[in-house]
């Protein structure tokens, strides 16, 4: 029997199996027997590629759902979920569109016994028309997992999507507003920056961050505190529940000394660490720590509005301080997480390091800084100021004694993949690097090995849009 997406099928079943029947002689009282019943399946209004299986459990430690499609194109299982309540909803993610599935609940008891429910049917729906499509060419060993893409499409519905290694969309969450930064946070939730206004400040969208569970249900929102406008470039959730995010600050300044206007509106950034309540735990103000004279070519300083800092990435270092990528200064800085002092500057105006072994003598208009486990710094160098412009992923080893930044690794993309804006580089567990080329057209994301060979190459096959970043994750759950 087939059921359309969203229709609820009640499969009332109650199985009470004595533990001895599955555990080779283990005894068990009636009160300790494993049981399941009241099974139903329903569609997910946020995502037709998923289902929600409800089940009533007795004396169960874990529960999962095994699934297979008909015809046999797709089969798998959810993880084993810890049973915390007698009634559980189990998410089933990453299904194929327009497919009939057989779903089976599998429960494991506290004593190791196992019981399975009867198979139930579920029919997935059709993907929305505005979900982009992709193709992949794989030519080598890749890091297993899924790839997250924040798609900036400027359409009635703007999707954050996740694709598998073949390029098939396996998860999405649409939004009527433009989206950008899309990440899976350490607690397993997803966050996405959403434009929440029809207005813009200079070239920025005024945004908020939405936090979802893996079914795309909205859990909460995050915004800058203190009346400041929220920047859409990055949100990082910390293990203690705090959030790091960026905000905008405007200040009228006389820039005639550097070729600007006497009444320029200069746009800078704040970095805030917020408690879950929204209370500010830490705030850093670029105007208090950096000179406006450090603005980097090709930024135009002659207009009424001057996009001064354009911070676009945050990372927490191994010693608990903060890295901040400041695009319009072509600079990465390290900030003391207690005092706010700038501990060092890499690149740009008054850099504390000399570049060694880098024929481009540093990076230009970069995105996505990260500290690697070995202490090195990895970033996506957009290369707007290189001659000619060219993008790359680049890694530097920092020598704090001699103040040198030595090129440890780079991958210079073909000039056809030059990304004037956006982009990201992520070092993967297998040593490869995932590179998103931002505004390059058509959309491209590549996995490159340590030797500089492209082993996985994704490109869009539908329309003109941009991908702000890409992240490889191990699981949808």
Pin down the residues of each PLM region.
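Sec-dependent N-terminal signal peptides of Gram-positive bacterial secreted proteins and lipoproteins
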Residues: 16-17
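Short, amphipathic alpha-helical segments
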Residues: 27-28, 190
